[in-house]
């Protein structure tokens, strides 16, 4: 398993229009970090279960990058959507945003898979179905803990499990 495999899997899933639209809706409504959710799902697709400690490390490792780089790029690109004179600039921002997201994937990878706790925080579970592992893993993201947003989490698993 490598960060490149995770990134390629994420891009393939994100290229599906219904999946992308749903993830972007959750990003807007719930402040979901799409790539964090995709990482949780990707681990499940690889029959890996992660513990809350790994999800917490991920959040700490990515927060500054998200706040300082990814979110401002996205917000500016969205704000410029209605101005046709800024179309070329918007396309450039989108390229920068994808590059920033790629770096975010590396931060996620390093926080979880590069940790000395990886052997206890990410466990191989070949006996558990992919959809179940995806559900468990997404449920460990702070946004979805304590039974929050169960229907949204379930729909996300359905969309991504079908594509796996």
Regions picked out by a protein language model, each given a short descriptive name:
Residues 1-16, 68-78, 99:
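An acidic intrinsically disordered interaction segment
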Residues 6-28, 113:
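Short amphipathic alpha-helical segments and their helix-coil junctions
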Residues 20-63:
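N-terminal interaction modules that seed assembly of large macromolecular complexes
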Residues 22, 31-38, 69-72, 89-92, ...:
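Residue-level detector of well-ordered alpha-helical segments, enriched
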Residues 50-56, 74-82:
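Short acidic alpha-helical/loop segments enriched in Asp/Glu that coordinate divalent cations
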Residues 57-72, 130-138:
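Short, mixed-charge aromatic SLiMs
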Residues 78-164:
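A charged, amphipathic interaction segment
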